[in-house]
């Protein structure tokens, strides 16, 4: 008769223990405890974010989700969704869920990392040449995982610096210029030329459009097709000083053009972070590149105003776009996280103030809390190297020679103790490789 009460007591004890473990797990991840202050920081970010989207989104509304991280950006119900999924034939939806914790943690890491592929990065990776290097070479699968390292190095050598040519905060004000046909509605040319750095995309021309897109061009992000036409791309900038950043792989035809024409512009391969199902295309990679080296980033020529009907380019015929409503919502999220400032025909005032934009303190507190919730490496720890998944020492004599003179960049290098942080592109769990100087 006493067996049942004992069994019941054991079950109750087990259940209570499970509940306590569960509740404990809600506030502690990998030793990094999520405090009440952390939750308050996320709540403040979410609340301010919703107000920012409502105030600046030209009809978009932000609806808080089921927790402090999630938010839904909603289009007006009368929005005419023109784009259809080529696989299903279904029109694009009018609401999109975003995870603010993921976005804050990922983008703030981008701001403190390099986005240029280097030789020291490949050398430092475990089996970097056998497992990674060949993937950055067109048809690299035929290179037998770079067992002949000399051959692989020969194919990469023209685009592979030893150490990063750019560092975080190296530049002040940067403009990323997209290719949208909306650029022809507003004469942004002089305004764009006033930036310290201008980043353009693919084969977008400058001549004949200068009053709309400006004349300055510091960098150009290239997709696969544009990279294979490198000889034509270099003609777009009369100064021939534009640095060309290829986001895919190096081709033999590219190497041939660099050597034989010759092309004297700097050419590099991009090393980037994965943002999952976020806005796609060269535009997002251009923003990522800009955020990795600029204090502030402004964007022009992205289709971000209401009334989208088709993907247009300012220099050619209309083309089929890709998830335009999702893209507009994602870029609005970026603006309301303080990452970029949007310029468009309906937002043409250069002095426009982004209402309810978060402060640096708000973002920093939310980043710390987000990293704890997401179990990011080093979450809750202090110090510049706490987020590093791997730390490797540079060989003697290979410390990067810095010509950086901006105070903000020098302060960043001082904070990082001279270390360089790289995103681990092919690491399923994300993470960062940090290269430190030999002391």
From Swiss-Prot:
Chief localization = Golgi
EC class name: transferase
User: Keywords of this protein's UniProt record, alphabetized?
Assistant: Glycoprotein, Glycosyltransferase, Golgi apparatus, Membrane, Signal-anchor, Transferase, Transmembrane, Transmembrane helix
A GO biological process of this protein is: protein glycosylation
Q: Name the EC number(s).
A: 2.4.-.-
Glycosylated sites: 112, 148, 208
Q: Where, in residue ranges, is this chain on the Lumenal side?
A: 24-439
For this UniProt entry, which segments traverse the membrane?
3-23
Q: Which InterPro entries match?
A: Glyco_trans_29, GT29-like_sf
User: GO molecular function, one example?
Assistant: sialyltransferase activity
Topological domain spans for side Cytoplasmic: 1-2
The record's subcellular location field reads: Golgi apparatus membrane
Choose one Gene Ontology CC annotation of this protein and give it: Golgi membrane
In the bilayer, the protein is annotated as: Single-pass type II membrane protein
Homology family: Belongs to the glycosyltransferase 29 family.
Q: What does this protein do?
A: May possess sialyltransferase-like activity in vitro.
Q: What is this protein called?
A: Sialyltransferase-like protein 4
Native source species: Oryza sativa subsp. japonica (Rice)
This chain is encoded by the gene named STLP4
């Amino acid at each position: 008769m006493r067996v049942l009460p004992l069994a019941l007591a054991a079950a109750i004890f087990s259940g209570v223990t499970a509940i306590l473990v569960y509740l404990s797990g809600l506030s502690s991840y990998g030793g990094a405890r999520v405090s009440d202050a952390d939750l308050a920081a996320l709540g403040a970010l979410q609340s301010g974010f919703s107000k920012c989207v409502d105030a600046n989104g030209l009809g978009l509304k932000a609806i808080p989700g089921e927790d402090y991280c999630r938010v839904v950006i909603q289009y007006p119900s009368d929005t005419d969704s023109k784009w259809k999924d080529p696989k299903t034939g279904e029109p694009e939806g009018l609401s999109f869920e975003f995870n603010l914790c993921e976005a804050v943690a990922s983008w703030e890491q981008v701001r403190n990392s390099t986005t240029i592929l280097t030789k020291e990065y490949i050398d430092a990776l475990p089996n970097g040449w056998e497992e990674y290097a060949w993937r950055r070479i067109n048809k690299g699968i035929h290179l037998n995982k770079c067992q002949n390292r000399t051959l692989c190095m020969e194919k990469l050598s023209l685009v592979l610096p030893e150490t990063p040519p750019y560092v975080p905060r190296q530049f002040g004000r940067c403009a990323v210029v997209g290719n949208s046909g909306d650029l022809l509605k507003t004469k942004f040319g002089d305004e764009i030329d006033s930036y310290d750095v201008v980043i353009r995309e693919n084969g977008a021309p400058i001549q004949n459009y200068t009053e709309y897109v400006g004349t300055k061009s510091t960098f150009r992000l290239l997709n696969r097709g544009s990279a294979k036409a490198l000889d034509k791309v270099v003609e777009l900038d009369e100064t021939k000083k534009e640095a060309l950043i290829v986001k895919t792989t190096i081709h033999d035809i590219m190497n041939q053009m660099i050597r034989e024409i010759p092309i004297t512009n700097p050419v590099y391969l991009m090393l980037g972070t994965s943002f999952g199902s976020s806005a796609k295309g060269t535009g997002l990679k251009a923003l990522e590149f800009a955020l990795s080296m600029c204090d502030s980033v402004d964007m022009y020529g992205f289709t971000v105003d209401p009334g989208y009907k088709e993907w247009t380019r300012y220099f050619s015929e209309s083309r089929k776009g890709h998830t335009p409503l999702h893209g507009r919502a994602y870029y609005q999220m970026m603006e309301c996280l303080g990452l970029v400032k949007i310029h468009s025909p309906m937002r043409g005032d250069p002095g426009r103030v982004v209402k309810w934009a978060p402060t640096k303190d708000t973002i920093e507190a939310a980043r710390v809390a987000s990293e704890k919730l997401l179990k990011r490496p080093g979450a809750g720890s202090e110090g510049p190297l706490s987020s590093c998944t791997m730390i490797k020492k540079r060989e003697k004599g290979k410390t990067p020679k810095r010509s950086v003179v901006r105070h903000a960049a020098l302060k960043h290098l001082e904070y990082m103790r001279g270390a360089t942080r790289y995103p681990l592109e092919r690491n399923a769990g994300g993470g960062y490789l940090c290269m430190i100087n030999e002391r």
